[in-house]
Amino acid sequence: TIQEVENADAILLIGSNPRWEAAVLNARIRKAYIDNNCKIGLIGPKLDLTYNYQHLSESLDYLNELSNNNSDFNKVLDKAKNPLIIVGTSSINSNFGTSILETSAMLAKKIQKNKDINPLNILHQDISRVGALEINFYNKYVENDYSKQ
């Protein structure tokens, strides 16, 4: 939930610009950065955010480095007590969206510390999509069941 962002001590942003896509979320990330010394990593283009972050790569392929424990940011995620992954819908809607979502889900499962809090978050750009998902209006053709991961 958005409240959990304030408790995060490590956040991985994947293909997302929370400053423009979700200003309230960005304010919560900034609060975590200031209050919790939250470490933030970004995969995607360099951005002008309101807090410091470690730019990991412009390429979404870097997600494979993280899933294979070949990144320095893995140490940050492993040490974190409340890690979060925030995936932007623009990366999911790309040609490699299914792979990005699968890899993000696997990484989230690896770093999950609290069984009550799922570290994987999808930042939707359209509130109407969230409403549609809540009433189970979505494409039934999915290769994997992410709720079981």
Model-derived segments and spans:
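Catalytic alpha/large subunits of respiratory electron-transfer oxidoreductases
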Residues: T1-Q149
